[in-house]
Structures are given as structure tokens and as C-alpha cells.
């Protein structure tokens, strides 16, 4: 049994250096046609949505081709992005044409705090606000999610964030900082407890009780076996106990790969931002 959603990491390239990032670095990329052939095959087996992620997915030279191809296959597409593509008219046009949902990061109501947690792009906070302002003037029905990683640095600077946005998101999702891959040093100094995260989430839900935005939380271990990642090298992975675990490769025997996925991924609980709660 396959999940309804696959997170396709088009590239591991990124133009930011976020200290909490758990993205992997993949140097070897297989032929794009092989990746698309696999996605076309699983589309016929029930997978119906793709989250395009990375790295920063819009940095891939194949980004436009991937969008067009997956859209033609009948996939519903979401984009998890840092927003840096917005100044490229051609990429922006493709995103607005093909993507149903955009997830953008905001780490604080305070621009200085946000920019300290999202280094690499000058005035990133201001850039996100500009994107939201531009989206508010379009007549396109694009669903919006704002994501925030809660740390010791920003936990006290989140109240009122929704009030400063020019466009009200459908979902504001807060993530408890989790350790994975290369962010262990940051995790050790910035991690907040389950109790602190729960209280933060509750307080924000109360503060913004009259908002139409749904405020939800993702706890540190919520991710276990609830994602299926497709890497640019053709590997399929999931997360177990905050570590990425190899399931197999798209070149593996179909029966073997399906069995591995059904064993290692909780296909009924795969996280997708296409559900009503964008979880």
C-alpha cells in the first residue's frame, strides 16, 4: 500500500543557512526522466499529491519541467519554499499556474529575530511579507500555510504574528525543534520541552481565537513513519526516531519496494498539507 502523498526533494541545494535545518546533502542526482517515470507509475497506484521540497526546490534547473510534468500527470502540487523564487518572473508564473498550496516560513513577529534564524537571504522577513502582500492581490485560489520552528530564541516573539500578515493563511503550523542529520549542536542549545511547546501552542491559539487561521502543532516525534521522501538520487526514505532511514531505491523490484514502504511507512498517517488541517 502506498501513501497518498510523496515529498519530492528535487534538490538539496539551498541559498539559506538555517541553523535548525534537517535537510540532507545529496551530491549524486539520477536522470530526471527516471524520477518522473517512477512518479508516473505510482500516480496510477493511488499517490495523488506531491510536496515539492528540498533544499530549496526552486533552485533546481529542472523545477519548471518537474512542475509541468507532475501537473500533467494529474498530481495536486504543494511547494515548501523559502520564497526566494519570487523575484524570478518565469518561476513565479509557473508556481502560480501549477501549485495549489504554498508553505512559507516565518519565525517571529520580530524581523530581527526571524532574520537571525533564517540567515543567507538579506531581509528575508521583509521578503516574505512582500510575497504575502502580492498574493493578497491575486485572484488565484492558492492555499497558504505559514510554518514556524519554535526554539528558545523565538518562543517569546510569536504572539500577534498573524496580525502583522497582509494575507491570512489557512494554516499556521508550529514545529517543535527536532534533531536530525546535521543540526544537533543547535538542537542541544535551542530545544524546548514538550510542556513548553504545548503551552506556547495553547497560548497562541487563545491569542488568535477569533482568527480564521487554524493554528496547529507538530511535536518532535510526530514525524515518525509519517513521511515518504523521494531523493534526487532515487532513494526513498522515511523518518524513524528522528533519523532518516533508507527504504529502498526506485530501481528496486516493484513488489519488494511496495512491501518495504508498507512496512516502514504508516501509509494511513502520512503527513500531507493537502488535508483540511494541512498537517
Annotate the PLM regions.
Residues 112-126, 133-277:
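Radical SAM enzyme [4Fe-4S]-AdoMet core and its adjacent flexible, acidic
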Amino acid at each position: 500500500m502506498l501513501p497518498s502523498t510523496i515529498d519530492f526533494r528535487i534538490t538539496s541545494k539551498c541559498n539559506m543557512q538555517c541553523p535548525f535545518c534537517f535537510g540532507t546533502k545529496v551530491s549524486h542526482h539520477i536522470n530526471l526522466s527516471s524520477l518522473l517515470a517512477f512518479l508516473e507509475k505510482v500516480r496510477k497506484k493511488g499517490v495523488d499529491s506531491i510536496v515539492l521540497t528540498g533544499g530549496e526546490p526552486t533552485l533546481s534547473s529542472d523545477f519548471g519541467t518537474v512542475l509541468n510534468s507532475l501537473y500533467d500527470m494529474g498530481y495536486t502540487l504543494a511547494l515548501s519554499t523559502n520564497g526566494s523564487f519570487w523575484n524570478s518572473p518565469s518561476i513565479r508564473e509557473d508556481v502560480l499556474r501549477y501549485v495549489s498550496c504554498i508553505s512559507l516560513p516565518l519565525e517571529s513577529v520580530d524581523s530581527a529575530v526571524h532574520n537571525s534564524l533564517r540567515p543567507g537571504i538579506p531581509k528575508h522577513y521583509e521578503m516574505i511579507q512582500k510575497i504575502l502582500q502580492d498574493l493578497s492581490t491575486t485572484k488565484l485560489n492558492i492555499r497558504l500555510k505559514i510554518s514556524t520552528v519554535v526554539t528558545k530564541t523565538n518562543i517569546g516573539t510569536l504572539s500577534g504574528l498573524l496580525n502583522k500578515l497582509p494575507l491570512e493563511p489557512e494554516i499556521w503550523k508550529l514545529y517543535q525543534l527536532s534533531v536530525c542529520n546535521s543540526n544537533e549542536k543547535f538542537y542541544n542549545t535551542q530545544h524546548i520541552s514538550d510542556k513548553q511547546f504545548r503551552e506556547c501552542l495553547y497560548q497562541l491559539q487563545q491569542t488568535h481565537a477569533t482568527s480564521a487561521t487554524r493554528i496547529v502543532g507538530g511535536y518532535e516525534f510526530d514525524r515518525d513513519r509519517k513521511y515518504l521522501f523521494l531523493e534526487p538520487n532515487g532513494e526513498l526514505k522515511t523518518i524513524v526516531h528522528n533519523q532518516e532511514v533508507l527504504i529502498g531505491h526506485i530501481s528496486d523490484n516493484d513488489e519488494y519496494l511496495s512491501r518495504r514502504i508498507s512496512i516502514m511507512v504508516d501509509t494511513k498517517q502520512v503527513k500531507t498539507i493537502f488535508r483540511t488541517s494541512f498537517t
